[in-house]
Amino acid sequence: MRDPEFWHNKWAANQIGFHLEDVNPLLIRFWSDLAPKRSEKVLVPLCGKSEDLIWLANQHDSVQGVELSQIAVRSFFAEHFYTPTVTRLNAQHELYQFDELTLFTGDFFTAPVESVDLVYDRAALVALPEEMRAEYAQRVLQLLKPGGRILLVSMDYVQTELSGPPFSVPEAEIRTLFMGCEVRRVYQDTSIDPHLNKRTQAGLSRFAEEVWVIEKSE
């Protein structure tokens, strides 16, 4: 992943305003739109130490996450008093396993993740600059089984009015990134977003948080 030091430094300095202390209400509200089955495997790219992992592990037998920062993954297990089995896979990746959870540390693009049925992306696509997003979408679709589904949370604003991350990923780009898939927007909220402070949003001409259901063809 390009510029990994940016994210390593964020975690090292505990500058994690992107981290939610609770389960994302959009996950709770819209996960059922994927018609998920407990036996279906889930992937959470760039998972951080998200509480969403716990919620998903209560719904599914296998939840995989990939996170660049070891600090984030170790904090996740420590804060929940979990003691994972840790395996050094290679020079770039470690594997942390505990019950339904399997978390990889290291580069998402090279992590040895198993194929999955479902993907949950709240903070991955919007964390990547435009030049990396096509490669990311290609990697996600490579890992997604035929007929697999993605729940994607995105943001749409005028990029020149605010330097990301989180970056703006407008509808046209999402449809291009996932061309060949069925892409549906199931939610759009143009009110104040909790991830951006009010002063920041006051300088934006428009802002929307959106939720998408994306289905890969059989």
UniProtKB/Swiss-Prot annotation:
This is Thiopurine S-methyltransferase. S-adenosyl-L-methionine binds at residues 11, 46, 67, 122. It comes from the Bacteria. It catalyses: S-adenosyl-L-methionine + a thiopurine = S-adenosyl-L-homocysteine + a thiopurine S-methylether. GO terms for molecular function: thiopurine S-methyltransferase activity. It comes from Vibrio cholerae serotype O1 (strain ATCC 39315 / El Tor Inaba N16961). One of its GO terms (biological process) is methylation. InterPro entries: SAM-dependent_MTases_sf, Thiopur_S-MeTfrase_Se/Te_detox, Thiopurine_S-MeTrfase, TPMT. The lineage of its organism: Bacteria, Pseudomonadati, Pseudomonadota, Gammaproteobacteria, Vibrionales. Belongs to the class I-like SAM-binding methyltransferase superfamily. TPMT family. It is found in: Cytoplasm. Keywords: Cytoplasm, Methyltransferase, S-adenosyl-L-methionine, Transferase. Its EC number is 2.1.1.67.
